């Protein structure tokens, strides 16, 4: 989608840049017209929305979008006399539009935005969307409309800017060329009355709207958003519209916050734009919209919004213009003014332009829609979609059609959604729908196309549009007019009716919609206004909008407005508002009720609007359609939209238009409508019933396909189609290409069997009149008994069987898992029990370790492993080391249950920082005493120069006490029952080895569950002493100290330096070898950041005894093996390091040993090879001081 968008964007850009691109131009024109009108609408809406948005979004996205928009907006605005508006709009526009433009520009895809910003883009967007299609020279307007609308849809899809596109129209400047084209359109004015109308409307709106408008328009055009804005501004509604578009976009921005709004308005544009942030410019909203339906938004959806805008704009200009002038002018103008507060005056002018548009308004239908859109837009602007939606309403039909359809595909919602959907889409939960929409959007585009076509084509195809068409000009105008009022209503109802409107594009539908639409629209405007109002004081808006509706809308919108502001705003007010406002706005309960629905309503509005717009568009589009060729195609497209929809979702689509709507509304509508929206949407649906549109609601999904259809439509649209491809982008779906969207009469849902073959019966779902040739409105059902049926049945059966099988397997797995869990729970319970026991006893460690491995033999190293549950595997030195370091103390196992945990604690809480009971002294007092004694000793020792007394030495060792476990861990294994090898690694997981060893060593006594606490303590103490003795052995000591290999390693690596320093130190101090008296010498422990004094090891508070020595020897031997045993737990690196450290230490010790050897204790003298020496030496070191 994005790509397409980009492409389109580019195209658009191109278009913008190029006057030439007929389609583009056309689109542009159309877009412009649309944008002009719509743009204005957009702009106005934008202004309005802008304002609101600006306010809201302003804050949100104001910055960027603001800048962009502002620039553009200002450009336009200023240009236009919308200065006021401009600022606001700027804001608004800024928000959505500028960004859009800029972004768009920036982003190809975002072009949309740009479009919004820039006319070209806008148009381009249209183009983009509908570009191919767009270009229908004759159809320019149509095309433009269609294209624009479509394009807008698509383009818009791309860019909310299309929303802005109307703005883009402003880009008139660029688009101006298109404008030229457009102008031609204007020329075309006669041409299709909507062409002219549109152009006039649009254009007029844009340029015609009065010089200012033109300026504004131009500016708007140039500014695009602004243009829109300004025209909008002038339109008042225009601003709103702009806002609508922009507002949609812009509002979106406000919605940005409320994504909804964004979604809605922006959604249409910005939200959609979000992707097109540019549009978001308004993509602020975009962003939000994205949030809302970023997916959607990013997707085409936004464009649709844009598109709708465009469409709406395009149409709306006429539409808007007319109603505006007629009905709207005041109200709308007001509304618009309201929409663009500043626009008020501007609105006046704009209005004037509107009137200009009005003239086009002849095309009026479009113009009014446009105007309306403006109004709507303005109000709706939020409905950029609104514009679209509103516009849609007014333009809603448009937008719906156009926008919606346009967007439909992407953002059908944007279109209508824009107003209606969009919010839903964005704002709404509908969003999802919308998202679907996103997919759906394509359909919407189709619809949009439809609408657009309707809008654009409507002229030519008004009839095509059927009701839409029917509503057509008069209706359109009326619609718009009504729409405005009604749009409000419509919006409210619209939602329901939207479809209706859509569906019932027929005047009745349309009309009603228009009425409703008008109401709704008005609501939109109001909504928008509200939105805007919300954003900015829109209250006047309401007044100004059709007071009644205005109020309604307003009130709805108003109330909602603010909320809607974002929402409503975004969408149409109603829609958006609908959304929030929606609720109120869409008087429709459903809409109101379902939040999503509100969007739906919005959508509905769109729908209604669409309808209306469509009607209007159709009407107006009639004018527009004048550019019938594309028009029709567009319409066809539009119709196809339904078709597309239908195709996409045959049933859904059926409505075709509705699908479009659906698309447009899908989120709101379809998603909402159909689902939630059913009520709302449903109404729409029914509405849909009236026309393809209604189905749109249902077709929401289908609408998706329409996008493809849209593309298909695109072709039909011809030039428009081309741009329509973006719709295709939206194609997402259901793929019925909405090729013949244009002038074909609105598809009628027939559902009659058309052909039967041996194996299947084909049902014709939609009857598209003379345009049904290539439509894929058929769906076939395999006949029973046929091979196909059989195959399908088999497949189903197979799937069912597989599912059952899977379910069975799953159940078994579940059972297995349950059993597993049970087992684990059992283990845990056991563990807890053992832990409790352990805690009662030697809670600190042994028991815990036991606990962990209650099922294992007491000493089994495994227990340690269990203790260190996450056994990482054989060797994860780095991990282990890391985790070790992460521990409070390297030496101690992290978990309290750990056998060594206490050991660490045992070492000395102070030392280790563990407050665990000492290994041998659980009694805190005892521990305390001991520690004090040790510290005293140490101090004394240190004073004399590290004279370490063996006892002290041992105490230091004590550190190893826990370490001793470690040591044992290494060497102790032998001692232990557990196999040394076993313990090391098993324990080692992290502190495992040392724990294991400790377990094993200490385990002997300590771990053994059978031992009493006292025994265990005694044993442990012995063990500790033993170890400590061993500990004298530097190696052992090292090992012990480094309870864990890595710790050890760490010490080494970490402190080989320390070692050496220690050597120096202890050498200097003639004191203790680091190993021996780690503390004294700044031993490893010291190295390990233990407080020196705290090292005293509780275990060896007293000198070792012979038995300890013996033990020690026992240990010693294992200790010798230590490297091996250590190695198990250690990684190669660890081992190496440990070995290296050891060897270094050993060598140094050996040298030093000699001095101390004589001093060594016998026990230290235990015959150990090097170790013995080492160890003797260590001991000696200790003793030496003695």
Curated annotation (Swiss-Prot):
A motif (Nuclear export signal) lies at residues 1029-1037. Keywords: Acetylation, Cell junction, Cytoplasm, Isopeptide bond, Methylation, Nucleus, Phosphoprotein, Transcription, Transcription regulation, Ubl conjugation. Residues 17-29, 45-63, 107-127, 791-835 have a biased composition (Basic and acidic residues). There is a cross-link at residue 1179 (Glycyl lysine isopeptide (Lys-Gly) (interchain with G-Cter in SUMO2)). It is found in: Nucleus; Cytoplasm, Perinuclear region; Cell junction. Residues 128-151, 416-437 have a biased composition (Polar residues). Residues 513-563 are annotated as: Involved in binding BAIAP2. Residues 258-270, 349-365, 375-396, 484-503, 565-582, 618-628 have a biased composition (Low complexity). Coiled coil: none annotated. Transcriptional corepressor. Corepressor of MTG8 transcriptional repression. Recruits NR2E1 to repress transcription. Has some intrinsic repression activity. Promotes vascular smooth cell (VSMC) migration and orientation. This is Atrophin-1. It comes from Pan troglodytes (Chimpanzee). The lineage of its organism: Eukaryota, Metazoa, Chordata, Craniata, Vertebrata. The gene is ATN1.
């Amino acid at each position: 989608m994005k790509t397409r968008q980009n492409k389109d964007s580019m195209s658009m850009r191109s278009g913008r840049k190029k006057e030439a691109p007929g389609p583009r131009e056309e689109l542009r024109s159309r877009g412009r017209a649309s944008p002009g009108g719509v743009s204005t609408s957009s702009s106005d809406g934008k202004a309005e929305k802008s304002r609101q948005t600006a306010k809201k979004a302003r804050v949100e996205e104001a910055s960027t979008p603001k800048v962009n928009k502002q620039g553009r907006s200002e450009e336009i605005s200023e240009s236009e006399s919308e200065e006021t508006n401009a600022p606001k709009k700027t804001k608004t526009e800024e928000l959505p539009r500028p960004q859009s433009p800029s972004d768009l520009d920036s982003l190809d895809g975002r072009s949309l935005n740009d479009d919004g910003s820039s006319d070209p883009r806008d148009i381009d967007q249209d183009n983009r969307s509908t570009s191919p299609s767009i270009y229908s020279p004759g159809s320019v307007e149509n095309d433009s409309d269609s294209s624009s609308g479509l394009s807008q849809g698509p383009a818009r899809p791309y860019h909310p800017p299309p929303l802005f596109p109307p703005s883009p129209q402003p880009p008139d400047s660029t688009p101006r060329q298109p404008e030229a084209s457009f102008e031609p359109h204007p020329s075309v004015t006669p041409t299709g009355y909507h062409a002219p109308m549109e152009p006039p409307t649009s254009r007029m709106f844009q340029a015609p709207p009065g010089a200012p408008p033109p300026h504004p328009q131009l500016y708007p055009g140039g500014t695009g958003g602004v243009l829109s804005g300004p025209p909008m501004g002038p339109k008042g509604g225009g601003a709103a519209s702009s806002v609508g578009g922009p507002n949609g976009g812009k509002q979106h921005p406000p919605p940005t916050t409320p994504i909804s709004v964004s979604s809605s308005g922006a959604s249409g544009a910005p939200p959609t734009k979000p992707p097109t942030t540019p549009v978001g410019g308004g993509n602020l909203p975009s962003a939000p919209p994205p949030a809302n339906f970023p997916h959607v938004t990013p997707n085409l959806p936004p464009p649709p919004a844009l598109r709708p805008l465009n469409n709406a704009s395009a149409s709306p200009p006429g539409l808007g213009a007319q109603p505006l002038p007629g009905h709207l002018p005041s109200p709308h103008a007001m509304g618009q003014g309201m929409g663009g507060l500043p626009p008020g005056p501007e609105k006046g002018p704009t209005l004037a332009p509107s009137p200009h548009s009005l003239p086009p308004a002849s095309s009026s239908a479009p113009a009014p829609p446009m105007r309306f859109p403006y109004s709507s837009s303005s109000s709706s602007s939020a409905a950029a979609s609104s514009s679209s939606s509103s516009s849609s309403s007014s333009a809603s039909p448009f937008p719906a059609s156009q926008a919606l359809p346009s967007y439909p595909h992407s953002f059908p919602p944007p279109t209508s959604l824009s107003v209606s959907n969009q919010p839903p889409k964005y704002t709404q939960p509908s969003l999802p729908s919308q998202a679907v929409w996103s997919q759906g959007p394509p359909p919407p585009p189709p619809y949009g196309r439809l609408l657009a076509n309707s809008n654009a084509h409507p002229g030519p195809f008004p009839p095509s549009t059927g009701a839409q068409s029917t509503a057509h000009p008069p209706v359109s105008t009326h619609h718009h007019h009504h729409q405005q009022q009604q749009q409000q209503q419509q919006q409210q109802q619209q939602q329901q009716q939207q479809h209706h409107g859509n569906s019932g594009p027929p005047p009745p539908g349309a009309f009603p919609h228009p009425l409703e639409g008008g109401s709704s629209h008005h609501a939109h405007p109001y909504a928008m206004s509200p939105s805007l109002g919300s954003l900015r004081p829109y209250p006047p808006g309401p007044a100004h909008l059709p007071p009644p509706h205005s109020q309604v809308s307003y009130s709805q919108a108003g109330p909602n407005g603010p909320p809607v502001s974002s929402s409503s705003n975004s969408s149409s007010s109603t829609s958006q508002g609908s959304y929030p406002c929606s609720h109120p706005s869409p008087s429709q309960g459903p809409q109101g009720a379902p939040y999503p629905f509100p969007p739906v309503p919005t959508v509905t509005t769109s729908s209604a609007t669409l309808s209306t717009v469509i009607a209007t568009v159709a009407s107006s589009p009639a004018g527009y359609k004048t550019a019938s060729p594309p028009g029709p195609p567009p319409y066809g497209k539009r119709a196809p939209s339904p078709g597309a929809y239908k195709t996409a979702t045959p049933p859904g689509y059926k409505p075709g238009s509705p699908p479009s709507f659906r698309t447009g509304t899908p989120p709101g509508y379809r998603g909402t409508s159909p689902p939630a929206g059913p009520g709302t949407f449903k109404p729409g649906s029914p509405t849909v019933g009236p026309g393809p549109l209604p189905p749109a609601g249902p077709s929401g999904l289908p609408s998706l396909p329409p996008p493809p259809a849209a593309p298909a439509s695109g072709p039909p649209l011809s030039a428009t189609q081309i741009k329509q491809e973006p719709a295709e982008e939206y194609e997402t779906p259901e793929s019925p290409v909405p090729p013949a969207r244009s002038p074909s009469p609105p598809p009628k849902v027939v559902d009659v069997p058309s052909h039967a073959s041996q194996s299947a019966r084909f049902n014709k779902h939609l009857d598209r009149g003379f345009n049904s040739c290539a439509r894929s409105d058929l769906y076939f059902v395999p006949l029973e008994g046929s091979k196909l049926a059989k195959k399908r049945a088999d497949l189903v059966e197979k799937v069912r069987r597989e599912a059952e099988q899977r379910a069975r397997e799953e159940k078994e797995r579940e059972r297995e898992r349950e059993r597993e869990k049970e087992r684990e729970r059992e283990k845990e319970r056991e563990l807890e029990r053992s832990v409790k026991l352990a805690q009662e006893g030697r809670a600190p460690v042994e028991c815990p370790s036991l606990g962990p491995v209650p099922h294992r033999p007491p000493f089994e190293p495994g227990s340690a492993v269990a203790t260190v549950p996450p056994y990482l595997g054989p060797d994860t030195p780095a991990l282990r080391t890391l985790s070790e370091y992460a521990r409070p103390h390297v030496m101690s196992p992290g978990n309290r249950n750990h056998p060594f945990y206490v050991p660490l604690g045992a070492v000395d809480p102070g030392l280790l920082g563990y407050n665990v009971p000492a290994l041998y002294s659980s009694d805190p007092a005892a521990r305390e005493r001991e520690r004090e004694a040790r510290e005293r000793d140490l101090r004394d020792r240190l004073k004399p120069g590290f004279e370490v007394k063996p006892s002290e030495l041992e105490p230091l060792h004590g550190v190893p006490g826990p370490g001793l476990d470690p040591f044992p861990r290494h060497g102790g294994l032998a001692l232990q029952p557990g196999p040394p090898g076993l313990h090391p690694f098993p324990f080692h997981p992290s502190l495992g080895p040392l724990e294991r060893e400790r377990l094993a060593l200490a385990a002997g006594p300590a771990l053994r569950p059978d031992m009493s606490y006292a025994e265990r303590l005694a044993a442990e103490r012995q063990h500790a002493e033993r170890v400590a003795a061993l500990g004298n052995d530097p190696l052992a000591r090292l090992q012990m100290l480094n309870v864990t290999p890595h710790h050890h390693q760490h010490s080494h690596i970490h402190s080989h330096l320390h070692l050496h320093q220690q050597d120096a130190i202890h050498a200097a101090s003639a004191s203790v070898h680091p190993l021996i008296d780690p503390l004294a010498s700044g031993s490893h422990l010291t190295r390990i950041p233990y407080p020196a004094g705290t090292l005293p090891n509780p275990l060896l508070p007293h000198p070792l005894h012979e038995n300890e020595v013996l033990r020690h020897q026992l240990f010693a031997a294992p200790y010798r093996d230590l490297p091996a045993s250590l190695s198990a737990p250690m990684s190669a690196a660890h081992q190496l390091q440990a070995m290296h450290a050891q060897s270094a230490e050993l060598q140094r010790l050996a040298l030093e040993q000699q001095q101390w050897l004589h001093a060594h204790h016998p026990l230290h003298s235990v015959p150990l090879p090097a170790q013995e020496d080492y160890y003797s030496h260590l001991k000696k070191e200790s003793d030496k001081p003695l």
